[in-house]
């Protein structure tokens, strides 16, 4: 089986789409012939270029109509030359371009589309793309329900939960974790509960709700907490609010990280508090795999990760007051954080692993193809 993965994101940071595609490509490259088409200079193109048994192709997915013809020609040439069995698209821009590039091809690939986010599906444009889509993958049950209510409901739909490498994302030795914590915070590391997130700093992540919650606490309780963030530089408005709340000294920003494990090892409690866009969150699952209980907002598929009070907590979206109440309990020692971390790790090993993620996705591919196309599979290599 020959598979082409496409992704339109052009930035250098590793986001959820990049993580998703790169893990599938690396995991399935011993079984199938894998190629990735992504913009030159993007994080995904760079990762693909370094992967063994994966071919990387520089491909733009422009939104401007004037740039579409050249991009369509480039992609059509690739599709015609390589004869892919499956093209797995991951967003509206690459989905649209694949649809256009496949027109009039004698041998058209089967198109699999993963719905990663919770952005509403436009009925008109989705109706057009659904006609050339053979299977839709939802990354959580919430998204599956949304997809089935959309024009894509006419397609075959499966839920395949995002998987993480639980051997790669695993708890650190306590001494190593303490060393990374000291390097991150210095003297502020001692006697404080470190709340951290590798989910990013975009506005829809609503991480400022946690800052607002700490600001609501009495000074002696607030002093028990420090917040650490990994991700892009704070926006001007975010920085302005930090300063207005007097919280600048209580927040540490480490920037964008290629490898988040040292950072995650240093924290006590993770959080993903999104109020838009988010679905299941790789970051949440990575933190849980590393033995960290996680606070999530009751939004989209985020609660599907958590057993409340066992391996994390679910709070109302955009609810600093509810967060502040939870922080009071954390400061008072009402939760056994190490035990909750062990429960998070155990759940990740049982439910979040790469194996089911890869096998379920491969099953979608096989079910989408006619029997004769399965001869492209490389037997015995996985």
Language-model features, listed with the residues they occupy:
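A conserved, positively charged/aromatic
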Residues: 106-141, 152
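Short hydrophobic beta-strand element within catalytic cores of glycosyltransferases
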Residues: 37, 293-296, 306
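Active-site donor-binding acidic/aromatic loop of nucleotide-activated sugar
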Residues: 236-237, 248-257, 263, 313-314
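Conserved donor-binding/catalytic core segment of Leloir-type glycosyltransferases
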Residues: 4-6, 188-205, 211-214
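Conserved acidic donor-binding segment of nucleotide-sugar-dependent glycosyltransferases
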Residues: 308-309, 313-320, 329-335
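N-terminal strand-loop element at the rim of the active site
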Residues: 5-15, 20-23, 27-67, 156-157, ...
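Short, structured helix-loop element that forms part of the nucleotide-activated donor/catalytic region
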Residues: 43-50, 226-249
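Carbohydrate-associated surface elements
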Residues: 142, 163
């Amino acid at each position: 089986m020959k598979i082409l993965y496409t992704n339109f994101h052009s930035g250098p940071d590793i986001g959820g789409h990049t993580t998703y595609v790169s893990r599938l490509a690396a995991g399935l490259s011993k079984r199938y012939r894998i190629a990735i088409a992504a913009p030159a200079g993007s994080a995904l193109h760079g990762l693909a270029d370094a992967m063994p048994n994966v071919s990387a192709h520089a491909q733009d997915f422009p939104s401007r109509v004037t740039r579409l013809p050249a991009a369509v020609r480039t992609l059509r040439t690739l599709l015609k030359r390589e004869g892919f069995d499956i093209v797995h698209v991951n967003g509206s821009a690459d989905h649209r371009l694949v649809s256009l590039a496949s027109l009039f091809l004698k041998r058209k690939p089967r198109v699999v589309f993963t719905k990663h986010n919770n952005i509403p599906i436009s009925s008109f444009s989705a109706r057009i793309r659904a006609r050339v889509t053979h299977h839709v993958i939802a990354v959580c049950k919430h998204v599956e329900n949304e997809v089935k209510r959309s024009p894509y409901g006419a397609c075959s739909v499966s839920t395949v939960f995002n998987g993480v490498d639980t051997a790669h994302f695993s708890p650190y030795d306590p001494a190593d974790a303490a060393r990374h914590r000291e390097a991150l915070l210095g003297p502020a590391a001692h006697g404080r509960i470190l709340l951290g997130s590798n989910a990013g700093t975009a506005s829809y992540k609503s991480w400022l709700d946690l800052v607002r919650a700490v600001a609501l606490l009495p000074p002696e309780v607030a002093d028990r907490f420090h917040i650490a963030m990994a991700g892009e530089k704070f926006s001007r408005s975010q920085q302005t609010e930090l300063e207005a709340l007097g919280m600048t000294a209580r927040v540490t920003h480490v920037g964008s990280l290629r490898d988040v494990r040292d950072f995650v090892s240093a924290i006590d409690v993770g959080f993903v508090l999104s109020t838009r866009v988010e679905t299941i969150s790789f970051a949440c699952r990575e933190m849980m795999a590393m033995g960290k209980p996680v606070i999530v907002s009751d939004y989209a598929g985020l609660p599907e990760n958590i057993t409340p009070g066992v391996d994390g907590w679910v709070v109302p979206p955009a609810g600093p007051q509810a967060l502040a109440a939870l922080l009071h309990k954390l400061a008072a020692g009402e939760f056994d954080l190490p035990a909750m971390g062990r429960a998070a790790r155990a759940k990740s090993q049982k439910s979040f692993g790469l194996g089911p993620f890869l096998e379920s996705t491969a099953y979608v591919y096989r079910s989408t193809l006619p029997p004769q196309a399965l001869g492209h599979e490389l037997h015995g290599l996985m």
